[in-house]
A protein has these predicted regions:
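Extended, charge-enriched "interface" segments that sit outside catalytic cores
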Residues: 5, 11, 22-171
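Active-site helical microenvironments for divalent-metal-assisted chemistry
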Residues: 12-18
Length: 172
């Protein structure tokens, strides 16, 4: 699926396809126990590292501020969380590694996933709410005999398509 054509592209990203689909594949017997356990371990490490960067403070330092300005972003005057720096568009998980002394040695894919989750943290809950609202709309049935051409404000082309497809609920 091309995520650019999906309504929920923040949730249906290619980087998290294993997290979304492997549990189903395992349940259906299409995935070995070894691969499934490997995926679970990967996301356990991601969650653990995300928790760490959300808690870890960095103190202001001349070297850090020079580095930040060199990367086109403002320096810090008070301490900040590692996650706050990762959220900046000019920076990322790997870029700030020299200033994160408690960082464990992890596979690059773990760091990439941590960065993506940190950067999308504000947007994903909103999209999950949107998905839940759409699910509720799917429970609202449409009258079978509704003539969409009688609805004022609806373009003729849209009304004709709706009359042709006859959606059964508001979610469709």
């Amino acid at each position: 699926m091309m995520t650019s054509r999906s309504e929920y592209r923040l949730i249906l990203r290619q980087d998290n396809a294993d997290q979304r689909l492997m549990p189903l594949g395992h349940e259906l017997g299409l995935l070995s126990e070894e691969r499934y356990q490997h995926m679970l371990e990967k996301y356990r490490l991601v969650a653990q590292e995300k928790k760490r960067v959300l808690k870890t403070n960095l103190a202001p330092a001349p070297e850090l501020n020079a580095f930040l300005e060199q990367h086109g972003t403002s320096g810090i005057t008070t301490g900040c969380k590692v996650a706050d720096l990762i959220r900046r568009p000019q920076l990322g998980y790997a870029v700030i590694a020299p200033f994160d002394p408690t960082r464990p040695a992890l596979e690059p894919v773990i760091g990439e996933q941590v960065e993506i989750q940190i950067k999308y943290d504000g947007y994903i809950p909103k999209q999950l709410e949107q998905i839940e609202r759409m699910r509720k709309l799917e429970n609202r049935k449409m009258p079978e005999d509704l003539d969409y051409t009688t609805i004022h404000g609806l373009r003729l082309e849209a009304a004709e398509k709706l009359n042709a497809h006859r959606p059964q609920n508001l979610g469709q």
